[in-house]
């Protein structure tokens, strides 16, 4: 903004025309689908608006702003094309560099997949140690120490890789590459440790089951009416559930049935007797009367069926359409109001 204020009116006019030409070229590129610098469109719009505000301020101050400036549009368009091509080359180079880095990383991962599992793990650990600083490596060693202490003692009986190589060289036999035999020894150790762990777990499970059997078999005394569950063994998932038998309801006798039937008959007789003839209903203790008599029909009433007087209505409509009312003389004559 400060740079624009320092320029003269001619320079501002020239810059305005150049920025308008560049904006037109960029919009044409966007319409064609090969726009390289979309952010430049907003910048040009803001620049043109600032130039116009400065010119209007100078016009208000009394300076002459009505100056025509000629700009060679061919040069401006050629300049814009060169800038866009250079920008496209830079962007292409950046994209190729990113693709090469990605392919290199994928190639390293493919090499790790080809190697055995133990070698790949060793390589990844080495890379992690190299990438971490010295302060963090001490922390990693401290974390690895308890893990190494938790390993079974069976793994210590096997000789290390270097000892095996030294024994073979002493006997005179050619020493085989260590990378092939190290994983085999580790696999054997892992299998033996797994079998030892399984045996120890089975023994613990048996001891716990034997300790819990007498306690599980003893039945607890429960109050009547509640369900009791007795578990035979800890390992089995089945359980015997004892449900108390429901108490049988007393079967109604013949005398009780007869008494109920008599009571129902008495109630029916009472209801029938309460209803009286003549449209009145009586209930015990109510005495409410309902009059169902209808009003007598008026003998002088005329009956009319819809559409019977259509002829009369037609004649009335015809006479009304033919005859027109004449206006009064008082309303048609113009006068002064004096008689």
UniProtKB/Swiss-Prot annotation:
<protein>
    <recommendedName>
        <fullName>Large ribosomal subunit protein uL29</fullName>
    </recommendedName>
</protein>
<dbReference type="GO" id="GO:0006412">
    <property type="term" value="P:translation"/>
</dbReference>
<feature type="compositionally biased region" description="Basic and acidic residues">
    <location>
        <begin position="239"/>
        <end position="248"/>
    </location>
</feature>
<keyword id="KW-0238">DNA-binding</keyword>
<dbReference type="InterPro" id="IPR036049">
    <property type="entry name" value="Ribosomal_uL29_sf"/>
</dbReference>
<feature type="compositionally biased region" description="Low complexity">
    <location>
        <begin position="171"/>
        <end position="182"/>
    </location>
</feature>
<comment type="function">
    <text>Specifically binds a DNA inverted repeat sequence (IRS) found downstream of rpsB in one of the ribosomal subunit operons (for genes rpsB, tsf, and unknown gene x). Might be involved in regulation of transcription of the rpsB operon; the IRS may be a control element to attenuate transcription.</text>
</comment>
<keyword id="KW-0689">Ribosomal protein</keyword>
<feature type="region of interest" description="Large ribosomal subunit protein uL29">
    <location>
        <begin position="1"/>
        <end position="96"/>
    </location>
</feature>
<dbReference type="InterPro" id="IPR001854">
    <property type="entry name" value="Ribosomal_uL29"/>
</dbReference>
<feature type="region of interest" description="Unknown">
    <location>
        <begin position="97"/>
        <end position="339"/>
    </location>
</feature>
<feature type="compositionally biased region" description="Low complexity">
    <location>
        <begin position="145"/>
        <end position="156"/>
    </location>
</feature>
<feature type="region of interest" description="Disordered">
    <location>
        <begin position="311"/>
        <end position="339"/>
    </location>
</feature>
<feature type="region of interest" description="Disordered">
    <location>
        <begin position="129"/>
        <end position="254"/>
    </location>
</feature>
<dbReference type="GO" id="GO:0003677">
    <property type="term" value="F:DNA binding"/>
</dbReference>
<dbReference type="InterPro" id="IPR050063">
    <property type="entry name" value="Ribosomal_protein_uL29"/>
</dbReference>
<keyword id="KW-0687">Ribonucleoprotein</keyword>
<dbReference type="GO" id="GO:0003735">
    <property type="term" value="F:structural constituent of ribosome"/>
</dbReference>
<dbReference type="GO" id="GO:0022625">
    <property type="term" value="C:cytosolic large ribosomal subunit"/>
</dbReference>
<comment type="subunit">
    <text>Forms homomultimers. Part of the ribosome; radioactive IRS binds to purified ribosomes.</text>
</comment>
<comment type="similarity">
    <text>Belongs to the universal ribosomal protein uL29 family.</text>
</comment>
<feature type="compositionally biased region" description="Basic and acidic residues">
    <location>
        <begin position="185"/>
        <end position="210"/>
    </location>
</feature>
<dbReference type="Pfam" id="PF00831">
    <property type="entry name" value="Ribosomal_L29"/>
</dbReference>
<feature type="compositionally biased region" description="Basic and acidic residues">
    <location>
        <begin position="157"/>
        <end position="170"/>
    </location>
</feature>
<feature type="compositionally biased region" description="Low complexity">
    <location>
        <begin position="217"/>
        <end position="238"/>
    </location>
</feature>
